[in-house]
């Protein structure tokens, strides 16, 4: 590829930079451009019969593949024109014909293959083509810019940073240099500390989860206690990018609730975690280990050590799967006979209908085992559903959550034992959150949430209902 042509190839990048956003932000996954590449994919075509377009003396000529093959100079001009103008549809038609030509510019063909692969979402293939080009022509800034962007898209952060650093040393046009700086800033933000926090004031019914019945035969149960709680949450996490999409993470968080009038129900959990993972444009997988400590009633209650596996993948631009498995061992500092281990497996499927609506369904399995007291052993089978909606131009948004589950215990409960039955619980959880984008303060939008939780059981002591209403405030730094 002649040197003049290598710089001419910057023209489509320069044009796109003029209309680019101020910064290549880390958008919400459901609106991320790289997951929409196949939505406008051209229909299968017979490339030998579809005409190409060549501009000659201000006119656009319609020429079929056979004619182009008989005119190598015209075919080369058509190929070069499609690449320089970043005409994906034109490259898709002309490239197969161009590759049949004996006399061809191998570098131009390789560059066109890279552009087409990237447009079709085959980013790894595009990176391979661009690397081959850079190896042959290290001073091709247009190719290096596309390589850097493809590496960024595929979340190979360390390699992308290296390429953008090299581009910074080039004498690029100001608009492209600005884009390079924005990409470098976005890469730094990917690996920066992320701090998030929130709090809410809750009016809560049945804090102590007392049974629905006050009396059962000769037994009298505790009365239900209502109260106001202050819920809080604060967390921080950092990611360190390694080579080829690998990364390590570390973080910590603390969350809990305080009941000003009922301090014996105060509950707090604090934990730290660290792990390693791999991510590219479609998937994110990793393993993390964690340590958590819980206090209840302002006194130490338990601590847990465990590990968590996760695998998230975009199956299509609109469908995403989220899977995780967690194992942990809990030590109860108040009652050694309550030590246990747990296993949790969760799978979710999310459908993003558009930027304003999404649906989610999930299946959960949770198992808890206590070697010292089999009466605490149970399996829980859960089903989850969520619907998020932004209501047109009104500014109002909502999130509806529904959940149902069954708990199967290994042994009878105290009261179910009188009936000769193992304990069986049925759970129902519902919540509705509402917020309006016009209501915010310093980037924080308050969210009103109403929730209801109900447990039905063949053991009367474990039947209860719980209602909560609260306004929550969340912020990510």
Give short role names for the model-derived ranges.
Residues 1-22:
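Gram-negative bacterial Sec-dependent N-terminal signal peptides
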Residues 107:
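Membrane-embedded glycan transfer/ligation machinery
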Residues 21-63, 71-72, 79-99, 111-477:
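Gram-negative and organellar
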């Amino acid at each position: 590829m002649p040197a003049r042509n290598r710089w001419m190839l910057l023209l489509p990048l320069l044009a796109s930079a003029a209309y680019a956003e101020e910064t290549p932000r880390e958008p919400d996954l459901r609106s991320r451009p790289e997951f929409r590449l196949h939505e406008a994919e051209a229909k299968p075509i017979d490339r030998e019969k579809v005409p190409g377009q060549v501009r000659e003396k201000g006119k656009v000529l319609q020429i079929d593949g056979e004619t182009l093959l008989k005119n190598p100079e015209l075919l080369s001009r058509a190929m070069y024109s499609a690449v320089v103008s970043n005409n994906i549809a034109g490259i898709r038609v002309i490239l197969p014909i161009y590759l049949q030509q004996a006399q061809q510019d191998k570098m131009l063909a390789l560059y066109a293959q890279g552009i087409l692969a990237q447009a079709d979402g085959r980013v790894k293939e595009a990176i391979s083509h661009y690397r081959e080009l850079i190896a042959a022509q290290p001073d091709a800034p247009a190719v290096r810019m596309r390589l850097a962007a493809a590496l960024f898209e595929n979340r190979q952060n360390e390699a992308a940073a290296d390429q953008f650093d090299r581009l910074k040393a080039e004498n690029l046009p100001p608009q492209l240099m600005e884009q390079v700086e924005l990409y470098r800033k976005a890469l730094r933000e990917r690996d920066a500390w992320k701090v998030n926090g929130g709090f809410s004031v809750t009016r809560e019914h049945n804090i102590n989860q007392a049974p629905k019945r006050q009396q059962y035969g000769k037994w009298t149960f505790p009365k239900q206690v209502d109260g106001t709680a202050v819920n809080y949450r604060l967390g921080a996490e950092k990611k360190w990018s390694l080579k080829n999409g690998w990364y390590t993470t570390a973080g910590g968080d603390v969350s809990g609730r305080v009941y000003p009038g009922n301090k014996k129900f105060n509950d707090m959990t604090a934990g730290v975690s660290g792990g390693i993972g791999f991510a590219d444009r479609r998937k994110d997988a990793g393993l993390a280990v964690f340590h958590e400590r819980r206090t209840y009633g302002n006194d130490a209650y338990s601590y847990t050590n465990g590990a968590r596996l996760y695998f998230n993948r975009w199956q299509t631009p609109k469908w995403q799967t989220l899977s995780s498995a967690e194992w942990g061992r809990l030590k109860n500092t108040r009652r050694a006979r309550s030590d246990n281990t747990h296993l949790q497996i969760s799978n979710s499927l999310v459908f993003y209908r558009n930027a304003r609506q999404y649906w989610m369904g999930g299946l959960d399995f949770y198992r808890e085992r206590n070697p010292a007291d089999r009466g605490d052993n149970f399996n829980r089978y859960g089903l989850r559903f969520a619907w998020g909606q932004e209501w047109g131009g009104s500014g109002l948004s909502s999130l509806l959550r529904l959940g149902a589950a069954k708990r199967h215990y290994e042994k009878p409960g105290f009261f179910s034992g009188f009936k000769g039955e193992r304990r069986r619980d049925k759970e129902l959880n519902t919540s509705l959150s509402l917020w309006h984008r016009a209501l915010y303060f310093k980037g924080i939008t308050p969210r009103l949430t109403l929730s209801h939780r109900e447990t039905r059981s063949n053991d009367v002591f474990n039947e209860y209902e719980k209602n909560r209403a609260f306004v929550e405030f969340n912020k990510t730094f």
